Each structure stands twice: as structure tokens, then as C-alpha cells.
């Protein structure tokens, strides 16, 4: 697509780096439904902050859950939590007060955490459940299958051609960028 021939191992390594940057850029653009995952974290009384897996880019929604024994078997009760930003979380008083959590804050660092307000007493609500959007895995070795849903494959090819054109075919940048953006819009609309 960008009018080049692969002549060296360096070209292939450059393409892999460009592909990894493309995947990172997709993560910055928004939610990709094939990377949404339900996570569970057992709550500990008085503990407000929990570490989440490092591949989590963000938490879309969260709730606390309890399971109680009912006459017809176990019954699950879920309470949705409200997501707040860092400023709102910082302004909250006494973050170690215990009770039924109603809000959560996601600290999106290299090792992300999720903080509940108030800290759970863990007598009734025993689990935190949350839907996370996970990072797209790097391209890895040259034989790996891309961590991409099939409807994003045309977009991936166009995006890679656009990224490579920035290095090797600057005269084709505008054409390839437009093709990439068109393919991306189609894929996102389908997602």
C-alpha cells in the first residue's frame, strides 16, 4: 500500500514497531469491544484501594456485589457505583471511613488501581466487579496473530501503511492517512 519492498530485517522490525504504535493509538481513540472484560476482586474490610491488572487501560463501569442465601437458593444483589475523577476523589473527606461504597476512582498509572469511597465493611458486599477495557497486545514475534477483531484487519493494514509512509514514503502520507481514517471509521461504526 505504501509502495515499498521489504529488503532487510530492519524493515520488518520497523513495521512491527509501527504496528505497536498503531495499537497504542487505537487505545487512545476509545473503546474496542473485543477488549472489554469482566473482572472480580474480593473486598477486604476497611481496604479502599485495590490493584487491577496492568493490561487494564480503564474501567468502564463497576459495582459491588453480595450473595445471600434465599429460600430458592443463592441470590445475588448488585449495586452500581458512580465513577469519579481524581479531583472529586481528592476532595472526599475521610477516605478510610467504612460502609457501603457508592463511588470509585481509577488511577490509570503503569500499575493501575481502583479506589472505592467509602471503604467497604465487607460484611454485606463481598465483591467488586468491574468491566475493564484492556490494552491491545503488542505485535510480539513475527509469527504472532494480531490481537485484533477481524473487522479491524483492513484498518490495521491501512494504518500500518500510513505509519510506514511517514518513515519511507512521505509523498504518500496524505492518501494513506485518508484511507486509514476511512477504514477506522467503518470499523468503529461496526463495533
Regions from the language model: what does each represent?
Residues 1-191:
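Glycine-enriched, solvent-exposed interface loops adjoining structured elements
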Amino acid at each position: 500500500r505504501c509502495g515499498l519492498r521489504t529488503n532487510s530485517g530492519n524493515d520488518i522490525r520497523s513495521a512491527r514497531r509501527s504496528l505497536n504504535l498503531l495499537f497504542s493509538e487505537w487505545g487512545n481513540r476509545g473503546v474496542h469491544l473485543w477488549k472489554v472484560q469482566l473482572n472480580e476482586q474480593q473486598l477486604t474490610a476497611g481496604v479502599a484501594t485495590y490493584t487491577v491488572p496492568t493490561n487494564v487501560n480503564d474501567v468502564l463501569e463497576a459495582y459491588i456485589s453480595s450473595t445471600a442465601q434465599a429460600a430458592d437458593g443463592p441470590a445475588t444483589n448488585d449495586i452500581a457505583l458512580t465513577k469519579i475523577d481524581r479531583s472529586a476523589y481528592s476532595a472526599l473527606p475521610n477516605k478510610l471511613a467504612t460502609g457501603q461504597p457508592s463511588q470509585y476512582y481509577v488511577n490509570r498509572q503503569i500499575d493501575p488501581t481502583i479506589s472505592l469511597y467509602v471503604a467497604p465493611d465487607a460484611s454485606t458486599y463481598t465483591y467488586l466487579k468491574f468491566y475493564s477495557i484492556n490494552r491491545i497486545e503488542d505485535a510480539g514475534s513475527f509469527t504472532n496473530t494480531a490481537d485484533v477483531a477481524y473487522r479491524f484487519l483492513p484498518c490495521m493494514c491501512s494504518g500500518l501503511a500510513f505509519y510506514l509512509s511517514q518513515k519511507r514514503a512521505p509523498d504518500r502520507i496524505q492518501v494513506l492517512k485518508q484511507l486509514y481514517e476511512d477504514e477506522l471509521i467503518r470499523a468503529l461504526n461496526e463495533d
